[in-house]
Amino acid sequence: MSGISAQTYDIVERRNSWNAGANVTGIMMENTNASYAELYGSNNQGDFRNSYEASKTWSAGATAKSITHLKDYSLIGSFSFDHTSGKDMSGSMFIHPGFYPVDILEFTPGRKDLQTYSFMGGIATNLNPNWRLGGKIDFASANYSKRKDVRHTNYRLDLQVAPGIMYHSGELAIGLSYIFGKNSESVKAEVIGTAESLYNAFLDKGLMYGAYETWNGSGIHLSESGISGFPIKELSHGGALQFQWKGFYGDIEYTHSSGSAGERETIWFKFPTDRITSHISYRFRQGSNEHFIRFNLQWSHLVNNENVLSKETVNGVTNTHIHGSNRIFEKEVFTANPEYELMSRRGELRLGTYLSTFKQLTTQMYPYVASQKMFCSRTYVSGVLHTGKLDLKAAVSFSTGNSSEKNRTAETNTEPGNPPYRLTDYYNLQNEYATASQATFNLGLRYNFNRGIYAEVQGSYTHGFNLRYIEGSSRWNETIKFCLLYTSDAA
């Protein structure tokens, strides 16, 4: 088929199970060319939100994506830009709160702006009738700013490079890929006003235990001599194996990352992480209908070690010495996502659930130990009905969870000091947001013009139940899109 298709670009991507993994040579397992461009704007409002989110935000951006198959090679690429702005924001100073094992919180509400740029490019080629070679790069950069004391400016970079190779014969395909990743973020804070000592910050070292003091105090690490802000980074290496036989596809990926906070000799934290990801799917046809059964798994284990540092100044030169380290935090996450999807000429149906368990342990001050277990689930159903030039969309999801915590004091022959400081209000709010029962309803309408141009409007409503710490129970979203889509079968 060539020309304009009712299927969206994400449908084209999901039809090929190899796109879930790291091996770009898998794009050659399908022969549909697709090009897509989108302009969008969205608005969010409501007080059912996390501690670092704004009650009102707006976003606008553009996205372009393409998959192209030529005679002996295939190309895939994308580019996107997004600008998001929110008022009266405080809490986490990081772009992706929770991504790293430490966090910095500030408490003065103000406007924050986030700009994100991303680029992805990949190429795969036939070496001979049975072997394929390819490579893919994903790059994203972001800057985040707040213009009210304590004001801060963040810069973040994410990079992943994944070369891969595939052997295929008939309906059998086996792939192998190497994965290199790097991410980094720098938080630079300052105060323009004169009341510098009145602004506090909190360094969260796990489960909201940490250091609470003035923003430029030595325990926060935002204003240390010789160091530009609070730099943090991760470097990872890994590999992946892919296998396909007829309609069955499976892969497994493993990466090990070395993370650190600080720079040069002054490294405050080191946090190695092991991650395993697996995608399993089965695809079959019944007439003109296609059915997909998927099962995705993710597991990660992280430990965070805080270095014991001292500084010595000799002849005007300050040197930092590391005297050892203490393991202050440990986290294990497991997520399972079974899913079923039906694709037909009349529409699509998709349903599934996310089941996640979290185990966290903090031991940042001997002999005090705190551990937490959390379970979260989200079940979702979505559908699209094609009726001439109109596509009707609907989705509903329900989330719930629970958590428990245990605190104990290890045996010691000495008198223990005061327990570590805890930001209890924020801890309770974030726990409730993660585990509260909530339902989300989404409706959308898409109108298809000629030549692949279409416009789409969407609206969603989220309601939280039985809340104690979150300010409100409702959250609304409205989105409008203008898009261009073209698909065709490769020659």
Give residue ranges: language-model regions.
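Surface-exposed extracellular loop regions of Gram-negative outer-membrane beta-barrel proteins
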Residues: 124-148, 156-162, 251-266, 350-358
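Outer membrane beta-barrel transmembrane domains
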Residues: 96-106, 204-343, 348-485
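Short loop/turn motifs that connect adjacent beta-strands in outer-membrane beta-barrel proteins
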Residues: 24-35, 66-76, 126-133, 168-175, ...
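Conserved small/polar residues in nucleotide/adenosyl-binding loops
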Residues: 486-491
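N-terminal, post-signal peptide beta-strand-biased segments of exported outer-membrane/organellar beta-barrel
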Residues: 1-87, 100
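Outer-membrane beta-barrel proteins
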Residues: 45-59, 110-112, 142-156, 228-230, ...
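Outer-membrane beta-barrel translocator/channel fold
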Residues: 82-115, 177, 184-187
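A surface-exposed, glycine/aromatic-enriched loop/edge motif typical of exported proteins
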Residues: 182-208
